[in-house]
């Protein structure tokens, strides 16, 4: 084999020579090797929005680059017969372009389409940290819970710490001693209104918030930011969802039903929702028997169009028709103590017909100037037509049950012809800018308000043949009111606020500071109010599970139609005028709170506590009967509200959310030199919401709601507040519901068109407690008065079904 050795040496030398030559040639100027060209262009998505950090690669030449923030790229490449260029980005389909014998400068416009393949589902559960005064509530917490009113969002609010209600038929609520009218409600940054003439939960019907459309719920019981309007108790901020695919649901129960359907894509979404509610079955448990005909119908639509990253157009429309007809027959109520039971029997003639028809719409056009800055123009309109008419006659007997002694016999006649029309239009401009540490927002709103009312109501009573009040000479009605008023006014509102986040580096303490100011001017009373507000959230470095919160601010209750109605009474005949000298009610909020997050057996919990003090000034006193609030029409008193709210929230049962809250409160006001509690003085309240599953399966789900709250002060009607010497019994109620998941198709593994099917049965007022809503007062000829309680609904069974697709 030795003769082959010279040939191997020669071959090896030739290989080295070839390698050296190739290396030298590669170092020569490119003009000696091959021509080059420049490839440039832009990568966008289907909406022509730039895709940043997309990969542009030519693997044959080992060249790779990334697109800029504007989606642009540039590469210098070698010319060849064909050059293969790949464009790729996570979440998009990879695109390949082949360039044939490219020369000079080549420009490409590349559109990447969304990819079909998605990552596997990953669930990350963590309690949201609250560093401001607005807490975010889970929208699905009440989805399968038992309900009497059908207003799921408001019932969720009523179960929070610091919030109370004494009427399961109503969606209204009191917050830390405030009246029903002191709570602002926003839907997609537009303030919404309630009907004006509603006087009972039976009439109320459906609220403006449709739970099927809700994406996010923000709620604050005090110390809220400057962007929320001139109300001095609470702010409820609702955001409607933008579905990106087809979805819908159907629900039915003995109390009504709802339907929801939505179409969606990346650029366009359209949601439609219809609700129908009838409380005929529920009202049948009241002691007043008769023919109830409540029919409440509501339709809402939400359209959202995002043609590109720069523009967004939203429209919300709502039509609501709440109709309540009632022909009473008779009533029998037994009340008193074990030792002294009294019976109140009434036979009725007449009927009641009420109609509340509202329209609401908003149009928003938003322009984004990059990812950090936006400007939005929002136009909205609200209109309501309301009618409350009744002629009711009752012949009553009040007897002592043990002795059959007649305590009072008589007749009463109630008449009302109340009509109201209102229209509120507004135009709002909102500017927002975000940076690394700041979130700046400001806005200006112009409003036009027009309200007309025509009211005539009276009540006549006689006892044993004598008309009350009995003077012996003159004939008077016990109550009579006439009103014919019109309000036309302009209102301008402006605010500016900043959320500043700082600290947090190298395990330092983190701070969230929100500060702002709000201004409002009302043309009716020529008043200008200025409201500074500030809140601070602290996450200390020594314990990141702890959050401390402090807030202070001057809040005003800008007067609206109800507060303006100043009454004067002569010989039991009341006339109503609008008081142009009325001023805004004032409340100084001082709040200190904390959140502490911890785990028990691997399950997350959060303990929240808040101390608050509200100094109240320029108060307009009012009385409450059922849900009707009647104001004095003038600034006559000052007062305060102070208390503590505690809430424990967490997974009492793995995989479920439950909570229990405790509120203690003291309120006082000074009226005509006398100190007395506010009409909504609720000294204590306990709310609990608990969910559970059957052991070994998640098909069966139980929901339990408990409420225990102190009774409110009250006195005889048409009396001054100084006579509030009584307090109603405590409000106690338990509702329980059991749901069975007939179909679980969340992952779409089955061919069924439905995603979920739930069947449920509820027991409303589980313990059958007779809660007092208000009182009917009987007066005999000697002016002796008897308070007959008007009880709320009794125990009822409700069945329901929910289909989601």
Pin down the residues of each PLM region:
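Membrane-embedded beta-barrel scaffold of Gram-negative outer-membrane proteins
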Residues: 374-380, 581-635, 640, 759-764, ...
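C-terminal beta-signal and adjacent terminal beta-strands/loops
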Residues: 655-658, 707-715, 740-805
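Short acidic/polar hinge/loop motifs at secondary-structure boundaries
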Residues: 74-76, 191-219
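Surface-exposed extracellular loop regions of Gram-negative outer-membrane beta-barrel proteins
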Residues: 281, 329-330, 334, 541-590, ...
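Transmembrane beta-barrel wall of Gram-negative outer-membrane proteins
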Residues: 249, 253-276, 289-329, 352-381
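Face-selective signature of the C-terminal outer-membrane beta-barrel domain
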Residues: 306-322, 351-525, 608-611, 659
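Gram-negative outer-membrane beta-barrel transporters
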Residues: 506-507, 612-615, 634-715
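Short, acidic, small-residue-rich periplasmic hinge/interaction motif at the N-terminus
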Residues: 42-46, 54-59, 86-93, 102-146, ...
């Amino acid at each position: 084999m030795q003769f082959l050795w010279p040939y191997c040496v020669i071959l090896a030398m030739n290989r080295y020579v070839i390698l050296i030559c190739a290396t030298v040639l590669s170092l020569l100027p490119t003009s000696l090797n091959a021509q080059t060209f420049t490839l440039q262009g832009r990568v966008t998505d289907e909406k022509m929005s730039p895709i940043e950090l997309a990969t542009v690669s030519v693997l044959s030449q080992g060249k790779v680059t990334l697109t800029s923030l504007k989606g642009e790229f540039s590469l210098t490449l070698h010319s060849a017969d064909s050059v293969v260029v790949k464009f790729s980005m996570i979440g998009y389909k990879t695109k390949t372009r082949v360039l044939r014998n490219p020369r000079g400068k080549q420009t490409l416009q590349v559109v990447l389409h969304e990819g079909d393949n998605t990552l596997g589902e990953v669930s990350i559960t963590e309690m949201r940290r609250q560093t401001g005064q607005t807490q975010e509530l889970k929208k699905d917490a009440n989805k399968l819970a038992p309900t009497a009113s059908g207003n799921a969002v408001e019932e969720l609010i009523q179960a929070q710490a610091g919030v109370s209600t004494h009427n399961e038929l109503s969606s209204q609520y009191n917050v830390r001693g405030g009246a029903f009218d002191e709570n602002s409600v926003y839907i997609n940054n537009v303030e919404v209104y309630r009907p004006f003439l509603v006087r009972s939960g039976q009439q109320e019907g459906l609220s403006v918030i449709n739970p099927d459309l809700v994406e996010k719920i923000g709620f604050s019981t005090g110390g809220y930011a400057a962007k929320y309007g001139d109300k001095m108790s609470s702010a409820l901020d609702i955001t409607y969802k933008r579905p990106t695919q087809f979805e819908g649901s159907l629900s039915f129960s003995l109390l009504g039903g709802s339907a929801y359907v939505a179409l969606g894509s990346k650029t366009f979404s359209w949601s439609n929702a219809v609700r129908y509610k009838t409380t005929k079955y529920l009202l049948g448990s009241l002691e007043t028997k008769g023919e109830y005909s409540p029919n409440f119908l509501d339709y809402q639509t939400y359209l959202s169009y995002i043609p590109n990253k720069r523009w967004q157009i939203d429209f919300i429309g709502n039509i609501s028709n709440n109709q309540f007809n009632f022909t009473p027959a008779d009533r029998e109520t037994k009340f008193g103590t074990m030792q002294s039971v009294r019976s109140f029997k009434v036979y009725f003639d007449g009927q009641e017909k009420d109609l509340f028809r509202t329209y609401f719409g908003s149009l928003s056009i938003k322009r984004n100037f990059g990812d950090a800055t936006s400007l939005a123009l929002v136009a909205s309109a609200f209109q309501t037509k309301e009618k409350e008419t009744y002629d009711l006659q009752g012949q009553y007997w009040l007897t002592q049950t043990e002795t059959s002694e007649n305590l009072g016999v008589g007749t009463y006649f109630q008449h009302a012809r109340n009509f109201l029309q209102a229209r509120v239009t507004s135009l709002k401009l909102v500017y927002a800018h975000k940076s690394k540490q700041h979130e700046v927002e400001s806005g200006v709103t112009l409003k036009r308000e027009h309200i007309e009312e025509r009211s005539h109501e009276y009540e006549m009573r006689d006892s044993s043949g004598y008309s009350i009040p009995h003077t012996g000479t003159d004939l008077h009605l016990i109550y009579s009111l006439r009103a014919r008023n019109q309000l036309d006014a302009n209102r301008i509102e402006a605010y500016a606020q900043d959320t500043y986040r700082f600290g947090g580096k190298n395990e330092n303490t983190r701070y969230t500071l929100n500060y702002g100011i709000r201004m409002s001017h009302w043309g009716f009373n020529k008043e200008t109010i200025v409201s500074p507000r500030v809140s601070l959230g602290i996450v200390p470095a020594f314990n990141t599970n702890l959050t401390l919160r402090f807030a202070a601010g001057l809040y005003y209750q800008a007067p609206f139609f109800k507060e303006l109605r100043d009454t004067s009474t002569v010989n039991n005949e009341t006339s109503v005028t609008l008081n142009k000298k009325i001023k805004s009610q004032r409340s100084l909020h001082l709040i200190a709170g904390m959140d502490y997050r911890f785990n028990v057996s691997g399950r997350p919990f959060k303990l929240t506590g808040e101390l608050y003090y509200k100094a109240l000034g320029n108060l307009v006193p009012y009385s409450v009967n059922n849900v009707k609030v009647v104001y004095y029409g003038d600034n006559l008193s000052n007062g305060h509200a102070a208390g503590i709210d505690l809430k424990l929230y967490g997974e009492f049962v793995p995989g479920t959310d439950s909570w229990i809250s405790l509120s203690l409160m003291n309120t006082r006001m000074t009226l005509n030199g006398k100190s007395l509690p506010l009409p909504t003085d609720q000294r204590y309240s306990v709310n609990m919401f608990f969910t559970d599953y059957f052991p070994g399966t998640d098909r069966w789900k139980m929901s339990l709601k408990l409420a225990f709250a102190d009774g409110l002060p009250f006195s005889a009607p048409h009396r001054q507040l100084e006579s509030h010497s009584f307090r109603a019994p405590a409000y106690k109620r338990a509702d329980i519901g059991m749901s069975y998941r007939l179909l679980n198709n969340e992952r779409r593994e089955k061919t069924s068109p439905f995603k979920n099917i739930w069947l449920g049965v509820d027991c409303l007022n589980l313990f059958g407690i007779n809660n007092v809503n208000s009182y009917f007062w009987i007066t005999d000829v000697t002016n002796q008065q008897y308070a007959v309680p008007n009880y709320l609904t009794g125990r009822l069974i409700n069945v329901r079904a929910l289909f989601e697709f």
